[in-house]
Amino acid sequence: MTERTLVLIKPDGVRRGLVGEVLNRIERKGLTLAALELKNVDDATARAHYAEHAEKPFFGSLLEFITSGPLVAAVLEGPRAIAAFRQIAGGTDPVEKAATGSIRGDFALETQENLVHGSDSPESAAREIALWFPAL
């Protein structure tokens, strides 16, 4: 079944020049880019995207990080796109949970600045795509 997912290459990935590497891995996995845009994120979009974390102690630093510079937002399509991207992304904690060979396992150094975000369910993918790409 073909599905869509939202992927963000976060500001640390853009700053470190890893956009091409991430896109290469996405394409090698067989996923298709349906939309791609370099964006500077405003506070309202950041708050809406991370609303589920609003009451957590790290929310402020998360907002500060995600708005600290440009990021790349993309919509990917393909069979089981959500699970496929999450597999190549690796675990959220790049040191303890991300396998070598995954994006985070190979390039990320800490949990918050872990290079990429990928939707975790069809429901969150629909919500996130509508937020980042309202015309789709």
Curated annotation (Swiss-Prot):
The EC number(s) this enzyme carries: 2.7.4.6
Annotated binding of ATP, by residue: K10, F58, R86, T92, R104, N114
Entry's family note: Belongs to the NDK family.
PROSITE patterns: NDPK (PS00469), NDPK_LIKE (PS51374)
Predominant localisation class: cytoplasm
Protein name per the record: Nucleoside diphosphate kinase
InterPro entries referenced in this protein's UniProt entry, alphabetically: NDK-like_dom, NDK-like_dom_sf, Nucleoside_diP_kinase, Nucleoside_diP_kinase_AS
Reactions catalysed according to its record: a 2'-deoxyribonucleoside 5'-diphosphate + ATP = a 2'-deoxyribonucleoside 5'-triphosphate + ADP; a ribonucleoside 5'-diphosphate + ATP = a ribonucleoside 5'-triphosphate + ADP
Organism: Mycobacteroides abscessus (strain ATCC 19977 / DSM 44196 / CCUG 20993 / CIP 104536 / JCM 13569 / NCTC 13031 / TMC 1543 / L948) (Mycobacterium abscessus)
Gene (name only): ndk
CDD domains named among the record's database cross-references: NDPk_I
Keywords: ATP-binding, Cytoplasm, Kinase, Magnesium, Metal-binding, Nucleotide metabolism, Nucleotide-binding, Phosphoprotein, Transferase
Cofactor dependence: Mg(2+)
Molecular function GO labels: ATP binding; metal ion binding; nucleoside diphosphate kinase activity
Highest taxon listed in the record's lineage: Bacteria
Subunit organization: Homotetramer.
Pfam families, A to Z: NDK
